[in-house]
């Protein structure tokens, strides 16, 4: 679709006596449309999305051509003339100078965006996507895809990360959840693949800790690379390294040079590389999304193997996350060449659009009562995500909530990928109101419009807390996060209170009086041992539990006696 057609969709023009034909066509339209068009024309205003290039004169001219085409569809020759006029307008378009042209303007923008950027020889940020056209010869097809998907202004992280990547700089980037980090690395990656169109084979590699996040990144990449051809016959190819694709690569059904960009989880990628089914030596752009997770003790060896396999001399490395612990910063310094550090807001803070709340429940039974109170008081507004610390507890809460006639389902690592995908689709479409899960869905997955996140169990670290509550308050929307805690969580909630303070959340008087964490407490939190083992989730009274246990023991004893008697008879 022509970018100017998109920009002028639904626009109208003033009636001009000189343009009698158009005036007559407008007069013949419905009265409601005439009134609407006259009002828009009289106000002579162009919306922010339509005035993408900040050039009303050109857009008004395109509006004129669009109106002429709309009201003379039956005349083919006029249609052709209009298209030619639009092409001429595009060719004659003179882009304005970039909005950020010097260090002083960059300083003001960074102050406004709360951006903290450190490193050597830092390029200027962008103030709009128009800057990309003037500074980097940005591909118009990619720009068109951005507009089609309603991305009209760069977010703070995109303002910094995109020019850094296009200048081939290594970077460590930290920005709040829902702030547009995925686009911050996808936009420059696609542009760099286009720039390197003469080279065939894998150029960009994106690593994600979970299958759900990898799939989400893949879908976003597909949207942005839609209808982009590197030559007349070869489209820009993006792949998600799934189980089936891995098998095809191993069996040589598909050439490892077919794809330009691959998105994968670490273990699956390493398996394919070790089987010599995929060559990473020509990868020029390596991106770690959720870097704090990919470089913790669970994934660090796998991430190191991937780094070793990407041996290109001009490899560009990027790390993105909502939280950056000090150990990840040290790793970044050791593996990157002259890196730039980008922090939007505070590196341990949550999204400021999320209302955060701590609720004392006394004990495990109190948590179930607290959920029922949220429902009764009207605060349980779907869609809702509830996080628990283990699969066993997630299953138990699911069975409890089923009896309350709530539209609920559960996702955890024991469910198959097909089951997980179906549940996620149901949740995204609104068929499912409440989703119970473990930390498997705490990172990166973008659920539009989640109103409430409940931490049924206190997260083990501040980083886990930030990522969990980051499932709400995304893309400029507001959200709410409620964390239940008991007396056993007295140490575990201290990092949560710190995050709330750094995020500017409303703090109760008792929170101000909470003592700072001791060295021993910090060590316990770091190891995930800040609270004792939790009791089983159940609404069944204690006396009934004892009766059930005795009954079960009696049944088992009876079965055992029968087995012995049968054996003696034989």
UniProtKB/Swiss-Prot annotation:
Residues 162-342 form the Helicase ATP-binding domain. Keywords: ATP-binding, Helicase, Hydrolase, Nucleotide-binding, Nucleus, Ribosome biogenesis, RNA-binding, rRNA processing. It is an enzyme of class 3 (hydrolase). Residues 353-515 form the Helicase C-terminal domain. InterPro entries: DDX52/Rok1_DEADc, DEAD/DEAH_box_helicase_dom, DEAD_box_RNA_helicase, Helicase_ATP-bd, Helicase_C-like, P-loop_NTPase, RNA-helicase_DEAD-box_CS. It catalyses: ATP + H2O = ADP + phosphate + H(+). Gene3D superfamilies: P-loop containing nucleotide triphosphate hydrolases. Its EC number is 3.6.4.13. Coiled coil: none annotated. ATP-dependent RNA helicase involved in 40S ribosomal subunit biogenesis. Required for the processing and cleavage of 35S pre-rRNA at sites A0, A1, and A2, leading to mature 18S rRNA. This is ATP-dependent RNA helicase ROK1. It comes from Vanderwaltozyma polyspora (strain ATCC 22028 / DSM 70294 / BCRC 21397 / CBS 2163 / NBRC 10782 / NRRL Y-8283 / UCD 57-17). The gene is ROK1.
């Amino acid at each position: 679709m022509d970018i100017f057609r998109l920009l002028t969709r639904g626009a109208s023009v003033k009636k001009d006596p000189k343009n009698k034909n158009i005036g007559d066509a407008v007069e013949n339209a419905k009265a409601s449309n005439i009134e609407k068009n006259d009002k828009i024309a009289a106000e002579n205003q162009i919306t922010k999305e339509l005035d993408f290039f900040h050039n009303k004169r050109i857009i008004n001219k395109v509006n004129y051509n669009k109106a002429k085409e709309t009201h003379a569809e039956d005349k083919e020759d006029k249609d052709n003339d209009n298209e030619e006029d639009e092409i001429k307008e595009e060719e004659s378009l003179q882009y304005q100078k970039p909005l950020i042209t010097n260090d002083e303007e960059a300083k003001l923008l960074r102050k406004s965006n709360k951006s903290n950027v450190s490193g050597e020889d830092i390029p200027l940020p962008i103030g709009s996507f128009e800057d990309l056209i003037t500074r980097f010869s940005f591909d118009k097809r990619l720009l068109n895809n951005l507009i089609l998907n309603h991305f009209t202004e760069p977010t703070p992280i995109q303002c910094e990360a995109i020019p850094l990547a296009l200048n081939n700089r290594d970077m460590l980037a930290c920005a709040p959840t829902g702030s547009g980090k995925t686009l911050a690395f996808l936009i420059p990656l696609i542009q760099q693949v286009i720039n390197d169109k003469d080279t065939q084979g894998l150029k960009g590699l994106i690593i994600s800790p979970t299958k759900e996040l990898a799939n989400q990144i893949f879908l976003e990449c597909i949207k942005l690379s839609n209808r982009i051809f590197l030559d007349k016959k070869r489209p820009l190819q993006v792949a998600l390294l799934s189980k089936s694709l891995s098998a095809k690569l191993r069996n040589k059904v598909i050439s490892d040079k077919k794809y330009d960009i691959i998105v994968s989880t670490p273990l699956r990628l390493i398996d394919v590389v070790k089987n010599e089914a995929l060559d990473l030596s020509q990868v020029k752009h390596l991106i770690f999304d959720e870097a704090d997770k990919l470089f913790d003790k669970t994934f660090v060896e796998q991430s190191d193997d991937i780094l070793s396999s990407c041996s290109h001399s001009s490899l560009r490395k990027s790390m993105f996350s909502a939280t950056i612990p000090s150990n990840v910063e040290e790793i970044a310094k050791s593996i990157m060449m002259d890196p730039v550090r980008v922090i939007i807001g505070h590196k341990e803070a949550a999204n400021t659009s999320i209302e955060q709340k701590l609720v004392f429940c006394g004990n495990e039974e109190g948590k179930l009562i607290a959920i029922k109170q949220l429902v009764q008081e009207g605060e349980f507004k779907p869609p809702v995500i509830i996080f628990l610390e283990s699969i066993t507890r997630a299953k138990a809460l699911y069975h409890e909530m089923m009896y309350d006639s709530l539209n609920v389902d559960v996702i955890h690592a024991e469910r198959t990928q097909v089951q997980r995908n179906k549940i996620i689709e149901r949740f995204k479409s609104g068929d499912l109101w409440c989703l119970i899960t473990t930390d498997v869905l705490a990172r990166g997955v973008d659920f539009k419009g989640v109103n409430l996140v409940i931490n049924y169990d206190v997260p083990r670290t501040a980083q886990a807390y930030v990522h969990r509550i980051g499932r709400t308050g995304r893309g400029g929307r507001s959200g709410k996060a409620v964390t239940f805690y008991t007396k056993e969580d007295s140490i575990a909630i201290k990092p949560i209170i710190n995050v709330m303070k750094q995020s500017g959340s409303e703090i109760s008087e008792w929170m101000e009086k909470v003592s700072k964490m001791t060295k021993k407490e910090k060590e316990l939190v770091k190891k995930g041992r800040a609270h004792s083992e939790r009791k089983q989730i159940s609404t069944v009274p204690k006396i009934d539990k004892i009766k059930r246990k005795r009954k079960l023991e009696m049944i088992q004893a009876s079965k055992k006696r029968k087995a012995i008697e049968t054996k003696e008879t034989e």
